[in-house]
């Protein structure tokens, strides 16, 4: 039985988005033969009800909307907007403590927007010589979605989508 940490931007409950539904179902299946903890960068905004029966522990960062805006303004030149939003050192410190304390076998990151945390996790694994498998579940190639979207958008959005596509291609 593996000890798995599932890392997501938003807590996967309530099931209001496709990302939440995917995460919920992944956690449900993983919990059948593994111990699953969840770390979400954003605090849950609803009672966790049904998902709790599949989780060992859940914890979250405390990133605020204001902080996400600041992160976008500070980091969007370096990375895609969706990724820049979650450049959060405080969340990384909380996640780092969890990883070191709980000795996970597997860490799963959901979605490319967690690029910052993924890079930090890889560095931590290498620095501390941790025996942890790291999986990145990117669903699909968001870079291709942005490139395709650029073909149908007006001038400003076309340029933004093209830029996002290029940045995401490098990340993916």
Task: Explain the meaning of each model-derived region.
Residues 1-58, 100-102:
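N-terminal subdomain of nucleotide-sugar transferases
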Residues 9, 112, 138-141:
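Histidine-centered beta-alpha loop that forms part of the nucleotide-sugar donor binding/catalytic region
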Residues 30-31, 124-130:
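Short, conserved loop/helix-junction motifs that constitute active-site signature segments
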Residues 38-98:
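A conserved catalytic-core segment of Leloir-type glycosyltransferases
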Residues 44-50, 116-118, 144:
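Short, charged/polar "capping" segments at the starts of alpha-helices
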Residues 54-57, 125-126, 151-155:
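Short, hinge-like loop/turn segments at secondary-structure boundaries
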Residues 66-85, 135-170:
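Acceptor-binding helix/loop patch of EC 2.4 sugar-transfer enzymes
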Residues 95-116, 131-135:
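Short N-terminal targeting/anchoring amphipathic segment
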């Amino acid at each position: 039985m593996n000890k798995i940490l599932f890392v997501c931007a938003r807590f996967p409950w309530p099931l209001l988005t496709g990302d939440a539904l995917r995460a919920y179902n992944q956690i449900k299946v993983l919990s059948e033969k593994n111990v699953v903890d969840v770390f979400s960068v954003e605090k849950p905004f609803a009672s966790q009800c049904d998902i709790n029966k599949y989780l060992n522990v859940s914890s979250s960062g405390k990133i605020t909307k204001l902080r996400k805006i600041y992160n976008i303004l500070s980091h969007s030149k370096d990375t895609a907007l969706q990724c820049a939003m979650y450049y959060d050192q405080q969340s990384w410190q909380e996640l780092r403590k969890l990883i070191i304390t709980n000795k996970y076998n597997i860490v799963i990151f959901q979605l490319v927007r967690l690029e910052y945390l993924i890079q930090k996790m890889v560095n931590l694994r290498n620095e501390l010589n941790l025996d942890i498998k790291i999986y990145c579940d990117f669903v699909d190639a968001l870079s291709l979605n942005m490139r395709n979207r650029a073909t149908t958008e007006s001038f400003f959005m076309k340029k933004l989508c093209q830029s996002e596509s290029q940045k995401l291609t490098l990340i993916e």
